[in-house]
Amino acid sequence: NDYTLAHQAVENGQTAYVDAIIEQTGSNQYALDSIVFKTKQGEKIPVEIRGNNTIRLTLKGRYTFENEIIYAVVPSMTDRTKQLTAGAFTLWHMTDRPVDVVLVSVNGGNVNGLATEVAKIFKKGVATINIETQTARAELDLAVLGDNARLDIGDSGWLTNYNSEQKAVIADLKNKIDYNFNKYYVFVFGGDILPTKPIGGFMPLQRQFGFVFTSSENQNADEEGKGELAKTIAHEIGHGVFALQHPFDLYGKEIEGKTDWLMDYANGSLLNHMDWKQLHNPELKFYVFQDDEDGE
């Protein structure tokens, strides 16, 4: 039968704990202390027997970036010289990757209480988002939005570069904030700044500036909407900072909206193990921008 491996992350030099829930059928059952967890090389994982058929594993992060399979094995009841595999999971060892992000309140956009929620999402993938919030009001000159008074959104906003109107918005706001070239910025717009189509936000891949729209219509939009502001902001940071793509663009449209992953269009917030791999891709460089595309 097919067996789907679960994935667990642990930071290099740190400790993580995993609870294994033991389910057994039949009359001949194993004592919990006869179940051994070990690496492929045979190194045993320290465990603690707990109540409710639970074994707690103590996992140590030991590598900069590596993954290994941890096996749960039991002795064969018919041949005690043999071991049987009862289960397994993949353990990912990763080194923390810190990055600086500023949430900017524009025309009253609410950024209060978002930093902790956004940072928590990425910490599970061993990435630290150092979030600064600029709560002082930054007022956009609405004249830059043109005759329709809305921010022009093109197709596939997370993939393309900034258009001329978006560059004008960036240029206007950069002059009104404490801008630092070595930080990423997400502009969180108040209700008077709307896009030309329903969209939760956008941040082109590996670009410095992201845009998030706070109205209920846009937070629940079919495109880039996550239903909650913190999740939408994290989704856009995933695109702009870490070059994460939508899972349905990678694995097929039939899964769109059907996963609990951050980069899907449903309301999930989980980073899957392939996202972890991208977060820690050594070719992924931070704060590398092209001036003409970032509104300079």
Region roles according to the model:
Residues 119-131, 204-215, 237-238:
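Structural alpha-beta junctions
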